[in-house]
């Protein structure tokens, strides 16, 4: 399972995932979407909560996860919602690390 894996170091020379690899890994996740923003493939999901405090607490859990994996998402915190977007900045696209971290986010809920 993806949430049991660890991220590997990803440098600018790393190779991004093919569309087929992205689709295969996406099939292992629940509720995540492949999007393109500014021409960059990204992985995104919105989590819903009963209030701002729960959403904030979840955002903090993701921040801890990001520090542990040394891989950092964009996090949008709103009342009752947290939108998490993963992509690998160094390769301007998706790497297996993004799918690993997405699965780890789901494991937090």
UniProtKB/Swiss-Prot annotation:
Keywords: Lyase
Statement: the UniProt record of this protein carries the keyword Secreted: no
Protein name according to UniProt: Putative pterin-4-alpha-carbinolamine dehydratase
A Pfam family matched in the record: Pterin_4a
Species the sequence originates in: Vibrio cholerae serotype O1 (strain ATCC 39541 / Classical Ogawa 395 / O395)
Catalysis: reaction(s): (4aS,6R)-4a-hydroxy-L-erythro-5,6,7,8-tetrahydrobiopterin = (6R)-L-erythro-6,7-dihydrobiopterin + H2O
Record-listed E.C. numbers: 4.2.1.96
One Gene Ontology biological process: tetrahydrobiopterin biosynthetic process
CDD domains documented for this protein: PCD_DCoH_subfamily_a (cd00913)
Gene for this chain: phhB
Family the UniProt entry places it in: Belongs to the pterin-4-alpha-carbinolamine dehydratase family.
A GO molecular function held by the record: 4-alpha-hydroxytetrahydrobiopterin dehydratase activity
Cross-referenced InterPro entries: PCD_sf, Pterin-4-alpha-carb_dehyd, Pterin_deHydtase
